[in-house]
Curated annotation (Swiss-Prot):
Record keyword Transport present: yes
InterPro entries linked to this entry: ATP_synth_F1_ATPase_gsu, ATP_synth_F1_gsu
UniProt xrefs under Gene3D superfamilies: 3.40.1380.10, ATP synthase, gamma subunit, helix hairpin domain
Main subcellular localisation: membrane
One Pfam family, short name: ATP-synt
GO function terms (MF aspect): ATP binding; proton-transporting ATP synthase activity, rotational mechanism
Lineage: Bacteria, Pseudomonadati, Campylobacterota, Epsilonproteobacteria, Nautiliales
Highest rank taxon of the organism: Bacteria
Gene Ontology CC entries for this record: plasma membrane; proton-transporting ATP synthase complex
Function (record text): Produces ATP from ADP in the presence of a proton gradient across the membrane. The gamma chain is believed to be important in regulating ATPase activity and the flow of protons through the CF(0) complex.
CDD domains named in the record: F1-ATPase_gamma
Full protein name: ATP synthase gamma chain
Protein's membrane topology: Peripheral membrane protein
Intracellular or extracellular location(s): Cell inner membrane
Length: 292
């Protein structure tokens, strides 16, 4: 059984931890509010551009023989893909990072079964550390972008993949990130950015156009903006989810510390009471001995 001094030290240590986790929760709550605002400003645009690109893809069925953009092509034989993974640079956010990593490993295994080669581009220190530890090769490592999403940097990263896609060096571009649903929920999203799926059933009307070089140039510009903003939005979404997960984790840690302090205090009081009782018994025994 621990001594009174040891119990007192434990209580003090847990209380200090409780103060730290409470402070971290408050910081995460404030950061989450800002991240939520950024998501709200961007979500509708991201949804709309995604909707527009898939609608264009469907309508291009009428002129697909005249349009030579690989972004809208149906690629039968997929040999190599770019997988872009987004995690946090920091931990202490529950299962936020590991959920994304697990989904990535699952996708890698599925692609390997199909004999597909993978170029893994990893954004976020935690995933980079994990993949290095387990010996999974990475094509590109990016630290700092998930903590501070930047459109220009996201565009630069995705454009390298796009150029390789156009040049037929890769056949797919896939993103994986843990996204924000609400303050209590996060969800891992796996999205195939390119090629953009063509579904004739999605549209009853087709484009009535005379395809030319200008038309293809406009489409190519739209595709670039689409993939750039898709990655940028995924970064914003991931950051909001990270702060949400960390806020929950620190709240749970604070509550656990509070419960531990309560239990240790009970144990301390019990030990102190036993010590006092023991001392009283010794005093009474000594007095009785002196009387004899």
């Amino acid at each position: 059984m621990a001594t009174l001094k040891e119990l007192k030290q434990k209580i003090s240590s847990v209380k200090n931890t409780q103060k730290t986790t409470r402070a971290m929760k408050l910081v995460s709550t404030a950061k989450l509010k800002r991240a939520e605002e950024a998501i709200m400003r961007s979500r509708e645009y991201a949804r709309k551009i995604d909707e527009v690109m898939h609608e264009i893809s469907a309508k291009l069925a009428s002129v697909k023989d005249s349009i030579e953009l690989r972004a809208f092509a149906k690629i039968e034989n997929v040999e190599k893909v770019d997988v872009i993974v987004i995690t946090a640079d920091k931990g202490l956010c529950g299962g936020f990072n590991i959920q994304t990593i697990k989904q990535t490993i699952k996708l890698i295994e599925e692609l390997k079964e199909k004999k597909v080669k993978i170029r893994l581009k990893v954004i976020g220190k935690k995933a980079i550390e994990y993949f290095k530890f387990v010996g999974i090769d990475m094509y590109e490592e990016v630290i700092g972008l998930s903590a501070a999403p930047n459109y220009e940097k996201a565009a630069e990263l995705i454009q390298k993949s796009y150029e390789d896609f156009v040049n037929e060096e890769i056949d797919n571009i896939i993103t994986i990130h843990n996204g924000y649903v609400n303050k209590l929920t996060q969800q891992v999203y796996v999205k195939e950015l390119l090629p953009i799926e063509v579904d004739v059933n999605d549209s009853q009307e087709f484009l009535e156009v005379e395809p030319d070089n200008d038309y293809e140039t406009i489409l190519e510009t739209l595709v670039k903006k689409y993939i750039e903003y898709s990655l940028y939005y995924a970064l914003l979404d991931s950051l909001a989810a990270e702060h949400s997960a960390r806020m929950q984790a620190m709240d749970a840690a604070t509550n656990n510390a509070k419960e531990m302090v309560h239990q240790l205090t009970l144990e301390f009081n019990k030990a102190r009471q036993e010590a006092v009782t023991r001392e009283l018994i010794e005093i009474v025994t000594a007095i009785e001995a002196m009387k004899k």
